[in-house]
Every structure is written in C-alpha cells, then in structure tokens.
C-alpha cells in the first residue's frame, strides 16, 4: 500500500524559492495548454482527445521543454485523468444514470496562479533529492536540493509533489512511499460507534459498553483565535483598500491555523485507530 508524508519546505535560498515559483508557474501554463487542446477538440469534434495525441501536440511547446520530461508528462496525465472523469460522467448521463447539469468540463487554472510539480520517477543521492530539470533549464539555473526526512530513509519513494500554497508564498512537499500492508486479524463482531461534536470532538462507544471522549475545546479555541485575528487584519486591509487578495500576514495566520488543525485531527484519528487495535475491534 502507499502512504504519504507531508512537510513544509523550509530553508530555501532566495534563488531556490524563485526557481520553484517559476517552475510552478510553467506547470500552470502547461496545464492550461493541455486543457485547451482537449476542450477545443471536444467542441469541434465532440470527441475525447487522448493523452497520446495531446502529448504529440504539446511536446514541442515552450512550456513543455522548460520542464523535465517526466514532470511535464505527469501534468498531461493529470489533465487526462480529469477529462476521463468528465467523459465517464457524460456517458452515465446519456444512460440516464447521472444528471447532465452536473457534468462540467475541467476549467482553466487562474492566469496568475501556480500548479503542483509532480515527480513520478524519483532518484535520490543518499538522503538528498535534486529537483530534475530539462536540459534547456539546467543551463541557466542552479539545482534545488531537498533533504529527505529521516523517517523515509529506508522507504521506497514512488512520487514527490511540490505544492504551492498561498499564492506560492510557501511550498509543501509530499512524499508518497510504498510499504507492505499489515495484516491484522481483528474481531469483525466488535464495533465502535463515533459521534462528532464541538466541545467533545468525538464520543466513541463500543458494542461491549466501553466508551471514551476526545476533547474538541482545543480545536474550538484554535478557530476562535484565528477568527479574531483574521477579523482584525481584514479590518485594516479594508481601510487600506487592499482588494480581495490575501495579505502576507493573513497567509501566515491561515497556515498556522491549518497546521494546528491538521495536527490535532491526525492525532485524534491515530488515537481512535490505536484504541480499535488494542481492543480487537474489526
């Protein structure tokens, strides 16, 4: 099975940061190019443009040649997957199994936006990962080197994603690695019912009469603090006629809140899983 480790990319130099922004912008441009080709083919011929034909059209484009070939192909495959889902829903709609009104073509990414960099073929140099470049890009840019977290030292990494966050003010990196699934012979007659709430995030009761609570007040206070600080920053922004864009301070605040919520929810889920394993709940 596959698991994922997600981290925030830190300790980037100014040049490395700008390179990642530039590559993510190029990835967005290639994504929109790929979407355009499939959409236009559908409008003109009422047919699906497969990945192979889209690749043949775009492999000589400027955006494709600026990216490493593996990364560029991953982008085209992502677009291909989106359109396969659309045409799959369209087929169901023609059979009367899905409403036509819910079938929507994949949309373009924002013109000033960024897209995720996907590395599907990972090569490591010890505990370091060097972001792959195209031959043309490598001539004029220094390499971006990322240290792999120690927890992945003995793992087989299958894919790496670099995700721009908050208008590419910072980046997250996701490592997808392969492990053998643990086979547990738990009792299928033992069950656990979970009720989600606010002050009590989870109220869990087993069919053997045992129960436990997971506190939700900490999560509630995190959101209350965020709303209070964000309202203050929004008030200042409105007085300065800053517009609808998120400010740097708001982006930092949102990132902190999201990290705290993600950490708390992950630990709560881990506690439930551990309880089920210890009590033979299958």
Enumerate the predicted regions with their spans.
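Nucleic-acid substrate recognition interfaces
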Residues: 1-282
């Amino acid at each position: 099975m596959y698991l994922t480790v997600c981290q925030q990319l830190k300790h980037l130099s100014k040049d490395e940061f700008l390179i990642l922004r530039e590559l993510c912008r190029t990835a967005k441009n290639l994504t929109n190019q790929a979407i355009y080709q499939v959409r236009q083919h559908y409008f003109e011929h009422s047919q699906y443009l497969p990945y192979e034909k889209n690749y043949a059209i775009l492999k000589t484009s400027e955006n494709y040649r600026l990216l490493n070939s593996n990364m560029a192909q991953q982008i085209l495959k992502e677009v291909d997957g989106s359109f396969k889902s659309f045409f799959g829903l369209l087929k169901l709609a023609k059979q009367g199994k899905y409403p036509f009104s819910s079938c929507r073509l994949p949309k373009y990414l924002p013109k000033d936006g960024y897209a995720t960099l996907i590395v599907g073929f990972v090569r490591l140099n010890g505990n370091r990962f060097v972001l792959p470049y195209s031959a043309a890009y490598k001539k004029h840019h220094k390499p971006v080197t990322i240290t792999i977290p120690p927890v992945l030292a003995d793992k087989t990494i299958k894919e790496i994603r670099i995700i721009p966050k908050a208008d590419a003010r910072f980046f997250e990196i996701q490592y997808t690695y392969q492990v053998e699934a643990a086979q547990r012979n738990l009792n299928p007659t033992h069950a656990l019912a979970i009720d989600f709430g606010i002050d009590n995030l989870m109220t869990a009761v087993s069919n053997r009469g045992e129960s436990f609570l997971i506190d939700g007040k900490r999560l509630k206070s995190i959101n209350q603090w965020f709303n209070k600080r964000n309202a203050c920053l929004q008030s200042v922004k409105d007085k300065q006629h800053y517009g609808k864009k998120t400010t740097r301070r708001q982006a930092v605040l949102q990132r902190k809140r999201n990290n705290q919520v993600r950490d708390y929810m992950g630990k709560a889920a881990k506690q439930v899983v551990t309880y089920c394993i210890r009590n033979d709940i299958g």
